[in-house]
Amino acid sequence: MDHSAEKAAANAEVPQELLEEMLWYFRAEDAAPWNYSILVLAVLVVMTSMFLLRRSILANRNRKKQPQDKETPEDLHLDDSIMKENNSQVFLRETLISEKPDLAPGEPELKEKDSSLVFLPDPQETES
């Protein structure tokens, strides 16, 4: 039996090309350089994120320390439009108040405080 096993091993020789391909495919290298490069990359990512987080925290802290009464251009534009509207209302009110209509004797004249009551409904009436 020993002779037949040796004959089978001699006949079943693997070509050199196939051996080299198998060696390359099933290679076992030292993984230390790869592990170190991944470790360095992870450390760089952590340091960069910590740096960005710190900058964000400091920016938020500085923004809170600055005075809040600074007006943005949008606020200034809104203030201008409100002032123009108020000026036109004041002008309209002055012209209407200065021109007093001829009232017949005995007709009551509406005052400014009465006009708000006339035009606005009672809150109790709107609820029911």
UniProtKB/Swiss-Prot annotation:
Cellular component terms (Gene Ontology): basolateral plasma membrane; membrane; plasma membrane; protein-containing complex
Compositionally biased intervals (Basic and acidic residues): 66-80, 101-115
Positions of transmembrane segments: 31-53
Signal sequence annotation: none
Induction: Positively regulated via the bile acid-activated nuclear receptor farnesoid X receptor (NR1H4/FXR).
Residue segments, region Disordered: 61-80, 101-128
Keywords: Cell membrane, Lipid transport, Membrane, Phosphoprotein, Transmembrane, Transmembrane helix, Transport
Reaction equation(s) it catalyzes: taurocholate(out) = taurocholate(in); tauroursodeoxycholate(out) = tauroursodeoxycholate(in); glycoursodeoxycholate(out) = glycoursodeoxycholate(in); glycocholate(out) = glycocholate(in)
Modified sites of kind Phosphoserine: 116
GO terms for MF: bile acid transmembrane transporter activity; protein heterodimerization activity; transmembrane transporter activity
Membrane topology: Single-pass membrane protein
Cytoplasmic face residues: 54-128
Main location class: membrane
Residue ranges, Extracellular side: 1-30
Entry note about domains: The transmembrane domain (TM) is the major site of interaction with SLC51A. The extracellular-membrane interface is absolutely required for transport activity. The intracellular-membrane interface is necessary for establishing the correct membrane orientation that is essential for the heterodimer Ost-alpha/Ost-beta complex formation and transport activity at the cell membrane surface.
Protein family per UniProt: Belongs to the OST-beta family.
Quaternary data: Interacts with SLC51A. The Ost-alpha/Ost-beta complex is a heterodimer composed of alpha (SLC51A) and beta (SLC51B) subunit; induces the transport of SLC51A from the endoplasmic reticulum to the plasma membrane.
Protein name in the entry: Organic solute transporter subunit beta
Organism: Mus musculus
